Swiss-Prot record:
GO BP annotation list: protein quality control for misfolded or incompletely synthesized proteins
Protein's name in the database: ATP-dependent Clp protease proteolytic subunit
Catalytic residue list: 114 (nucleophile), 139
Record's subunit section: Fourteen ClpP subunits assemble into 2 heptameric rings which stack back to back to give a disk-like structure with a central cavity, resembling the structure of eukaryotic proteasomes.
Keyword Protease: yes
Main enzyme class: hydrolase
Amino acid sequence: MQPMFDRERNGLDTTGLGLIPMVIETSGRGERAYDIYSRLLRERIIFLVGPVTETSANLVIAQLLFLESENSEKDIFLYINSPGGLVTAGLAVYDTIQFIKPDVSTLCVGQAASMGAFLLTAGAKGKRYCLPNSRVMIHQPLGGFQGQASDIEIHAKEILALKSRLNEIMAKHTGQTVKAIERDTDRDNFLGAEAAVKYGLVDAVLTSREVKQE
């Protein structure tokens, strides 16, 4: 059966286009077009979608710093739909969230796994949310290295040090003990929205716009 739209047959490859919607705003000065993410940034909304990489982390950090410079008193809203990614990239975002003056409210849409879950719980206390059917997954950091035995030992020590630090931070934000975090992240641990609230990863499940953005 021939697909309704064949990119190759029609001579159009849309893979790299992104298909990002544009928003047209009209004012006394005329019309202005924004991509949807730039328009939402004006409302102090940032998206972390997909893997946490150095590139995506730098984009989030830049937006956090920009919004702080625009207004250091108003909350920032970070929407997360991520399977996780680089620990160091995630820690860079985490440190920025803690560093800037505005509260950062986090919201899981879809999934927040691994480093995505870590950043979800890093939001301001009382302002961390999940949507009803979102999923959260926590586990210990993953790593692999090839080389001489002495180099492997060095990298193994680094992974263990990162694991210890991540557990301490998770314990701080969830209210769990470090031992509980170590136990519960030993293997992939999936939680629904309500279970994430009970564990302390988030503060509430949002079913409608009951929480008004400032």
